[in-house]
């Protein structure tokens, strides 16, 4: 019988820590690209919502869908065809959209 590969809690914590660092770094790098000089970190979703006649949550969900579909496709494809950098990028982008959604929801609750 083949020996199972396991990940310990300590190893998982390291994975989580590294992923959070990637997320924070990417969000910081992309800030200027998506907000320009605007102080509102969520302005891109508000503008997209206004253009589409919907709430910022829905605009963000539409943008996030592309990343989730890409990640889903990778999960169902031959795993060997994707290198670690590609996995890192897709996972990080997907998580970052969820973090941004959290901020949109928080702002909406504060306004309401």
Predicted regions mapped to residue ranges:
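Intrinsically disordered, low-complexity regulatory regions
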Residues: 1-112
